[in-house]
């Protein structure tokens, strides 16, 4: 739901409460979000977190790609729960204010909130990270609870346990960018183990079950696995593979995008071609960064480079795993590929095969995952451009040779040279018989997608099974706006054991 602000909101400090940097922080960050030109109301998430407060489901890790609203979400949670501010006015009119338990939890909890990425920079090194966080949080807890003797407690979890024992107080711990060390210090095993131990001490064990009312971690990666189990196996993980009940609160969904398009008079069909593609359950999910930039710049283009450049995927797609490059080529052409996402260790170094690489690309947002078919695919035109830039920069010989063959096919198609078209498709079909079945229609569909790979420069991703009145068109290639005056739309009809005349008659009908 689009939220339209009616006045400038202000931060109100709760009387008698101490606002700290990490302990009971104020709501300034979320106020900025609510006051922004484009703000989508996602406070319905608070209804879920209120429901799991104080239950076994209170440990949450919600991972998603860059610029998918992670920080806005943790700022919202902090603003709602923190004792350090009075945000009744800020949340009035938003979705959560209509829930029966809105006031029961509003500004009622001691909240500890920190951003690990920011802390890493401030600490100066990964080795100093834990001591940096501890040296801020523990003194702030002492200031918040001077009546509790915390002088002998030098750890965050020790201080929380002591306060809980003395006063029965529980805490909400919110960690943004929890996985920075896992990503940026991928080969620093000692730093990672120290950090995982820090999180375990805070969130696992009998004492933690007493003092934690809610734990919410967010980052790009799910919690790292040790062997086959999560290092924090008491956390429920909501990811780009399966976000469960949190799906409506990840990115912008289609109804929200339609509202934005209506408000800013933007062509929704064009938005879908450029930025749709992530599927979580029954939801079409869009990258908020792209949509917000589109409303400002009014130009359909890739805004992904402002989030993470194609250089970040080069080392991944160049790994020497059987079938990896073939899978990338297939997905570039518009096809999807089967992927086993269950063995990935949730880090940046433990790759056993191409499935692990593809799973990481899903978590990074470069690929989408269809849980029903267990297949991965390139989401939309924006991401396809990033892959094209990556493969062009690296000069893939296989891709260059394949594109040359594909360009011959495309030119022959434009020139209506049926003989050359048949020869090129037969040649490409023969090359892929080792990985797909030769004779059925699905196999031929895959071959055609790959064969027309060069079309991605001039056409959007081919639309399969497009409704056309009587029946469906097997493939439709729609030219991009820049090329609509130069190249025709391509309509492909597949027939088994029938001639071209039959297909043409069906198209005409």
For each of these PLM feature ranges, what is it?
Residues 2-440, 455-459, 463:
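Phosphate-binding site recognition
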Residues 418-509:
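Structural signature of nuclease core domains in nucleic-acid processing machines
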